[in-house]
């Protein structure tokens, strides 16, 4: 015969929920800092040559 599970206490629920929130927060912070570092790293390493963006030929 099936026996119902015991109910999880509110404190355990709160602890687990806070752990889940903390993990997601740190993963968001880490991914944001990685995106920032990647978006600015390419600018300083390989600057774009100036004067080549608008080449026009006179006919």
UniProtKB/Swiss-Prot annotation:
Alphabetical list of InterPro entries matching this protein? Ribosomal_bL32 (IPR002677), Ribosomal_bL32_plant/cyanobact (IPR044958), Ribosomal_zn-bd (IPR011332)
Q: Name one Pfam family in it.
A: Ribosomal_L32p
| A single GO cellular-component term on record | plastid
Name the source's superkingdom: Eukaryota
Q: Which GO terms describe its biological process?
A: translation
The places in or outside the cell where this protein is found are:
Plastid, Chloroplast
Record carries keyword Acyltransferase: no
**What residues form the membrane-spanning segments?**
none
- What family is this protein classified in? Belongs to the bacterial ribosomal protein bL32 family.
Annotated protein name in UniProt:
Large ribosomal subunit protein bL32c
Source organism (scientific name)? Oryza sativa subsp. indica (Rice)
